[in-house]
Every structure is written in structure tokens, then in C-alpha cells.
């Protein structure tokens, strides 16, 4: 009778992983990344004076700000709300199109993993009551990086005439987006099994809400090069960041089992979990 045994354990496990490396390239005669960016800036009603504002990152979407301030897109024709990409030319009839073939490449790299650390303890009391407890800590890290490159196969196809009379030609551009997230969480699991005899067995367990503290960070940047290096541009955005807490719901399990000699086992289980309790803080 009394306490018969105690067991203690520790588990460390990588329960998820992210490992991705993608690369694609080719020649495009029809469309360009910067042309698409210029089109989006035009249809969304942005203006060059807004995108060029030194404080634009405080109130404008970052992608067109990076594009405009790094020289990927610009206004034309005396309009402040009409944009053209550095890879596009404006013909005499007003048509806007890419000046010639472009070499394009896209790469994406993703790294990260989720790790669990669990300390557990169990006790046997008189072969009648069995107690168990798990204390767990989880952590994860995630890093995402993508890069789009575009370069002129023949820069002379991409003539740009500046308002001051200067003439230059587009050479290449890079657009990068980076994102990272880290987080830690903690939880507890506690359970009991009672075996009163006569083939019966009762069990109950609870899991505390899992509290996950998550921090995110992101940035984008643009770089554009021309034959006249005096017009080259590079603009990084500020680092954006955010921290929040995600709380999963409380969970409880109850079970009853009865052994029918050597014929089999009858059991019933009930789980209680209110997902409406999940919340961000």
C-alpha cells in the first residue's frame, strides 16, 4: 500500500520543420515585375509626391514606396498619378510596353523548425491510483526570404529620357522581401487513472491553455541600376515588427472502461474543449 513507484522523464523533440529552396529563371518578352508594380500604383491611385515623401513608410504601403524611391517605377507625362516601370518604354502613340527581352529570376528560401521540451512525472499509489503530469515548453523559429531579379539583355532597348535632358538605359533591378518569426509557448497536462477493481477503470485529464508568445519582423528593399550610375537607387524599408500572444483553449478528457473478462473491453470517452476561447492578445 502507499506510494509504490515514481517515474521521471524528459523529452526533447523536433515536431515540425521548414526547409525550402526554390529557384526559377527565364527570358520574358512580354511582362516585367516593375511594369506590374507601376500598373498597381496607378490603379490604386497613388501619387509620386506621396510615394517620394521621406515619411511615406509611415502611412503608405511599403512595396510601392520601395519601388518608387529605389527607381523601379516613376511618374511620366507630367502626371503625378501615372506610373511607368524602369523596364518599360513610352512610344510616340502613348503605348507603354517593355522595351525588349528581360532576364528574370526568382528565388525563395525558407528555414525553421518547431521544438518541444517536455518534463513528465508519474506515480503509482497502491496499484489503485496512477497520477501523471507533463510540463511542456515549445519554441519555433521561421525565416522566409525571397528575391526577384530582372535585367536587360540589351540595355539599349530600354532608353530613358530624363526631364533635365539626360539619357540613360536600364540595366537591372533586385527586389527582396524578408520575414522572420520566433515564438515560445508553455502548457501543463495532468491526469489520473483509478482502478477500483471488478474490471472497471476511470480516467480524467486536463490540459491547461497553451500560451504562445510570438514575435514577427519583416523588411523589403529595392535596388535599380542604370548605365548612368549617378541614377542608381537603393531603398530599404524600415524593419516592421509585431509581438502578440496566442492562447489556445483549456481541454479536459474523461474516460470509463470495463473489461468483459477475456471477451473484450467496453469504453466511453468524453472530451471538452471550447475553441471559442482561443484568442490573440
What are these regions (language model features)?
Residues 2-281:
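Outer-membrane beta-barrel porins/channels
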Amino acid at each position: 500500500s502507499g506510494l509504490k513507484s515514481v517515474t521521471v522523464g524528459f523529452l526533447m523533440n523536433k515536431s515540425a520543420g521548414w526547409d525550402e529552396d526554390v529557384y526559377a529563371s527565364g527570358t520574358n518578352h512580354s511582362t516585367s515585375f516593375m511594369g506590374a508594380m507601376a500598373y498597381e500604383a496607378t490603379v490604386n491611385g497613388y501619387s509620386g509626391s506621396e510615394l517620394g515623401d521621406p515619411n511615406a513608410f509611415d502611412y503608405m504601403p511599403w512595396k510601392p514606396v520601395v519601388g518608387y524611391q529605389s527607381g523601379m517605377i516613376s511618374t511620366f507625362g507630367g502626371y503625378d498619378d501615372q506610373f511607368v516601370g524602369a523596364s518599360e518604354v513610352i512610344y510616340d502613340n502613348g503605348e507603354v510596353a517593355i522595351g525588349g527581352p528581360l532576364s528574370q529570376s526568382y528565388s525563395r528560401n525558407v528555414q525553421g523548425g518547431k521544438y518541444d521540451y517536455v518534463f513528465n512525472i508519474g506515480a503509482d499509489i497502491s496499484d489503485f491510483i496512477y497520477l501523471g503530469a507533463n510540463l511542456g515548453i515549445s519554441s519555433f523559429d521561421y525565416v522566409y526570404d525571397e528575391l526577384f531579379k530582372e535585367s536587360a539583355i540589351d540595355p539599349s532597348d530600354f532608353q530613358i529620357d530624363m526631364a533635365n535632358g539626360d539619357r540613360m538605359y536600364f540595366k537591372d533591378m533586385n527586389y527582396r522581401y524578408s520575414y522572420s518569426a520566433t515564438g515560445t509557448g508553455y502548457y501543463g497536462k495532468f491526469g489520473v487513472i483509478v482502478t477500483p477493481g471488478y474490471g472497471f477503470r476511470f480516467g480524467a485529464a486536463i490540459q491547461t491553455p497553451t500560451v504562445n508568445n510570438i514575435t514577427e519582423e519583416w523588411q523589403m528593399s529595392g535596388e535599380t541600376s542604370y548605365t548612368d550610375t549617378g541614377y542608381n537607387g537603393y531603398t530599404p524599408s524600415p524593419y516592421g515588427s509585431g509581438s502578440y500572444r496566442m492562447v489556445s483553449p483549456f481541454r479536459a478528457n474523461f474516460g470509463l472502461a470495463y473489461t468483459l473478462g477475456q471477451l473484450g473491453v467496453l469504453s466511453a470517452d468524453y472530451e471538452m474543449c471550447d475553441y471559442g476561447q482561443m484568442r490573440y492578445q
